[in-house]
Amino acid sequence: MVKKEMIAMILAGGQGTRLKNLTKKIAKPAVPFGAKYRIIDFTLSNCINSGIDTVGVLTQYRPLSLLKHIGSGIPFDLNRLNGGVVLLSPYVKESEGYWYAGTAHAIFENIDFMNEYDPTYALILSGDHIYKMDYSKMLDFHKEKNANVTIATINVSFEEASRFGILNTNENNMVEEFEEKPKIPKSTKASMGVYIFNYQLLKDTFEELKSKGNNFQDFGHNILPYILKKYSKIFAYEFNGYWKDVGTISTFYEANLDLIKNHKNLDLREKNWTIFTKSSSHSPQYITSGGNVVNSLVANGAKIEGHVSNSVIFENVKIGKNTIIEDSVIMSNAIIGENSFIKKTIIMENTVVKEKMVLNSLNNQSLNEEDGIILYDGKEK
C-alpha cells in the first residue's frame, strides 16, 4: 500500500437508543435525514471534500443498512485502487474476539487496517453528527501548533455542557484540562468528537496502556486524559460552523427543519461542498393542481395533493387531497390519507396515516415523544 499522510476512521456502530424507533432496525448513522440522505453522508462527504481518500467505517450495531448504503464507495467517489472506503466490523482474532467496548477500543481493534497505510496522522470521526467541515484546515492547524492531538471544539450553552467532553484551554488554545461530561462544567468549549492524532503517538499510547493492564475503552475517559498528563501538547481547534449531534428525537427533528431555515453553514446546494449519497431511481416529484408546497424540501418520487409548509418530505411519499402538513418530517414511502392534519410530527418510513387523522401534540398527548414532537409509526399506543 502507498503511504498516506492522513486517513480517516469513522465510528459508525452506535445504537442510538434515544432515537427510539428510528434506530430499532438500523444503526444511528444509517438513519435517513434531510429528504434523501443518511446521517453518515455528512461525515463521509466532509472526508471527500477535504481531500481524504482513505476511510475506514467501523460498524457494529445492525450494520446491514450501512453496508448496503455505502457499498464499494462509488456514490461517494471512494472506490479507489489505493485507499477508498472500507467497512470494518468486529471480528475474532486467533486468541480473542470482542464487540467494541468503546470508541478507543474500536480504533485499537483496527490498527492492522491503519498500519497498511502507515499514516502520519489519524483522523477519528463520529458518523452521527450533522455538519460541514474542512478537515484539511484542521490538519494545517495541527501542524502549525506542532500538536500531538488536536480536538475540534464548538461552543455550547452552559446547560448543554454537561453532555459533552469539556476542554479548558489557555490563550494559545492549548488544552490544560479535559473533563468528560462533567456535572459542573468549567467552560462551554465542547469536544465535537473530531480528533487528529499523530499516529505513532496514538499507537504508543495504546501499547503503553495495554502493557500496564489499563482500560482504554474510550477516548474521552481514557486516551485523552492519559496523553494530556504524559505528553501534553493537545490543542483545541475552534469550529464556528453549524454542528448538531442528532442523538435525540428533538435534535433530529430540529436538524431536519434547520435545512429549510437558510443556515449559511448548512446549505445543501453549496456548489463547492457537495453532500454525496446513494441516489435512488424515483421519478420526479409531482405536485398536483390542488397541491401546494411552501418553504419545504421535497424529494423525488413524492406526490403531493395537499398543502405542505415548513416541512421535509422524503422520497416516494404520498400526501392525499385536502391534507395539511406543517412543521413536520415525513420519511420515505409514507402514505398520508386525505383530509388529515399533521403538525410538528415525524412520520416514520413506510407508515400509513389514515384519512381524517389529526397528529399534533395538543390532540395526541399519548404520542408526545419529546418536547412536543410526535414520532409516529402508524401504531396506536
Curated annotation (Swiss-Prot):
Pathway: Glycan biosynthesis; glycogen biosynthesis. InterPro entries: ADP-Glc_PPase (IPR011831), ADP_Glu_pyroP_CS (IPR005836), GlgC_bac (IPR023049), GlmU/GlgC-like_hexapep (IPR056818), NTP_transferase_dom (IPR005835), Nucleotide-diphossugar_trans (IPR029044), Trimer_LpxA-like_sf (IPR011004). Alpha-D-glucose 1-phosphate binds at residues 100, 165, 180-181, 191. It is an enzyme of class 2 (transferase). Keywords: ATP-binding, Carbohydrate metabolism, Glycogen biosynthesis, Glycogen metabolism, Nucleotide-binding, Nucleotidyltransferase, Transferase. GO terms for biological process: glycogen biosynthetic process. Its EC number is 2.7.7.27. One of its GO terms (molecular function) is glucose-1-phosphate adenylyltransferase activity. It comes from the Bacteria. Pfam families: Hexapep_GlmU, NTP_transferase. CDD domains: ADP_Glucose_PP, LbH_G1P_AT_C. Involved in the biosynthesis of ADP-glucose, a building block required for the elongation reactions to produce glycogen. Catalyzes the reaction between ATP and alpha-D-glucose 1-phosphate (G1P) to produce pyrophosphate and ADP-Glc. Homotetramer. Belongs to the bacterial/plant glucose-1-phosphate adenylyltransferase family. This is Glucose-1-phosphate adenylyltransferase. It comes from Mycoplasma mobile (strain ATCC 43663 / 163K / NCTC 11711).
